[in-house]
Amino acid sequence: MSMQDPLADMLTRIRNAQMAEKPVVSMPSSTLKVAVAKVLKDEGYIAGYQISSEVKSSLSIELKYFEGRPVIEEVKRVSRPGLRQYKSSDDLPKVRGGLGVSIVSTSKGVMTDRAARAAGVGGEVLCTVF
């Protein structure tokens, strides 16, 4: 069975692993997933990530906890295959008054909503993280 929404699968695996207090979560790798993992690491939501290139490449994400609680409190998929969400740089959503981040796929790559506003580019709002 093929996966319909690989990014939603990635976010669900992260959410489930954090609820089970796992230190690392693994999943099939893709270019988009690696780009999202890089943004999550740069923003401090995960401790790190690693790509292993065996027969099928897999992405391992090292989860981050603070005082026994997951750093990521909420992660939501915004744009989905059935309803894509494209926003201009002026209309990009702020998550919880700027405390969280929206991850946006732009023509200049995958970046946070703040970076996209600074670059003056819009794009597809992939997910929100708080």
UniProtKB/Swiss-Prot annotation:
GO terms for molecular function: rRNA binding; structural constituent of ribosome. GO terms for biological process: translation. PROSITE patterns: RIBOSOMAL_S8 (PS00053). InterPro entries: Ribosomal_uS8 (IPR000630), Ribosomal_uS8_CS (IPR047863), Ribosomal_uS8_sf (IPR035987). One of its GO terms (cellular component) is ribosome. Pfam families: Ribosomal_S8 (PF00410). The keyword Ribonucleoprotein applies. Keywords: Ribonucleoprotein, Ribosomal protein, RNA-binding, rRNA-binding. It comes from the Bacteria. Belongs to the universal ribosomal protein uS8 family. One of the primary rRNA binding proteins, it binds directly to 16S rRNA central domain where it helps coordinate assembly of the platform of the 30S subunit. HAMAP family: Ribosomal_uS8_B (MF_01302_B). Part of the 30S ribosomal subunit. Contacts proteins S5 and S12. This is Small ribosomal subunit protein uS8. It comes from Pseudomonas syringae pv. tomato (strain ATCC BAA-871 / DC3000). The lineage of its organism: Bacteria, Pseudomonadati, Pseudomonadota, Gammaproteobacteria, Pseudomonadales. The gene is rpsH.
